[in-house]
Amino acid sequence: MSQTILEIKDLYASVGETTILKGVNLSIRAGEIHAIMGPNGSGKSTLSKVIAGHPAYSLISGDILFFGQSILEIEPDERAKAGIFLAFQYPVEIPGVSNSDFLRIALNARRKFQGLSEFSPLEFFQLITEKIDLVGMQESFLTRNVNEGFSGGEKKRNEILQMALLDSKISILDETDSGLDIDALRVVAKGINTLAKSTNSIILITHYQRLLDYIIPDFVHIMSNGQIVKTGSVTLAQDLEKHGYDWITQT
């Protein structure tokens, strides 16, 4: 049986005085792809940010285990270095910082954490030129400032490039399909499928079943009112497409 990478135990979390997560339980093993679906306000994005350690959210109770160790007291940057990757729904722009510099710094921070030697600029360039084909981008993309002036599709492909480069143990993709046309969606999905391996795991957070036409998850979880209320296969997402989220509360 494959190793458990992430385990969430009876997790409660809040923003200010508002409790958002109300007893979330989830276990993810190496090699698995999990899709989390649900209506607006159900807690999907909150869950992703709490796993990553976003400071805006307060933990009330419960635990998050990464390879069997609690990460509640670990800072967000240390979680990232350890192998937890979060692709945001709305990637931020970083004026004045080139993609190449940003990616090399991020990669070397992770390598240093792992006790590995840092890549020189030349070594990094050789690696990144291999990875960039994965997301269908030109080399000129590397000299542009991070996400500055990028289209929605370019921003999402940039995050998949980061995911490919960092080789994280668990990647959480928050509404990666949001705002993508069908061609961009196919490119992004191809990259994600290529990166799915027996040694890592992926969480896809999405509103819509269309992403799951291109990336077939092992499990689909439905969130409602801060809890996972139903789990099934990809056919669960297809049922949602037909009947809507109200169907879940009625079954």
From Swiss-Prot:
Its primary localisation, in coarse terms, equals: plastid
GO MF: ATP binding; ATP hydrolysis activity
Against InterPro entries, the record matches this protein to:
AAA+_ATPase (IPR003593), ABC_transporter-like_ATP-bd (IPR003439), ABC_transporter-like_CS (IPR017871), FeS-cluster_ATPase_SufC (IPR010230), P-loop_NTPase (IPR027417)
Q: What subcellular compartments does it reside in?
A: Plastid, Chloroplast
Q: Which UniProt keywords apply?
A: ATP-binding, Chloroplast, Nucleotide-binding, Plastid, Transport
Superkingdom is: Eukaryota
Query: Residue limits of the ABC transporter domain?
Result: 6-250
Q: Which SUPFAM superfamilies did the record assign?
A: P-loop containing nucleoside triphosphate hydrolases
Binding positions for ATP?
A: 38-45
Q: Name a single GO cellular component.
A: chloroplast
Question: Which family, according to the similarity comment?
Answer: Belongs to the ABC transporter superfamily. Ycf16 family.
Q: What is this protein called?
A: Probable ATP-dependent transporter ycf16
| Provenance organism | Pyropia yezoensis
Gene this protein is translated from: ycf16
